[in-house]
């Protein structure tokens, strides 16, 4: 099982945490443009990072995350810069509720066109595509996510379901296991899971996952033969977490 990391804030301080990573890993780097992603990537010298994935983020006024409620100009900008490339890319498919809820009104007229635009990119991009997504409340929940344009059931993509135990304290072992089994059955080798959070994200108020809970959650993923777990985020890595990860690997 590959253990990888998201990094929403790829500052030198956060990237220095890579010194604790002694196993092959993958790094999902947030950046406002492909050019900035390439600049950050070029400055990282760590033989254990086997792959870098571009995680495009928008300005707050544009929606920050990718969804049909993001501004149309921002979506076109991100997709245009990736034309003709094969850079691995992760679309963080989340609604703008906590960053800019006004977009529900201002972008409603663009919703259908934006959804088609996102779908077209996902289906036609030449490189590897990952999508970070909410976990569904059953099959009906998955249909809701698809209707809202934050889930695209395209066979070629790799789907990362964000099962952040620290932010959803009601997640029981039984529920988590069902989500892992359901994802594996539906998406097979293209199913991934996101665990965390071990550091706050853009909201600044995310609860921190206890080390023992991380160990437990990772063990469940390993038992279900999930090919990759992505931890949010690298900047929260410390020696205690690193020791747990090394034992799991």
Give the label of every model feature segment:
Residues 1-249:
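Glycan-processing catalytic domains of CAZymes
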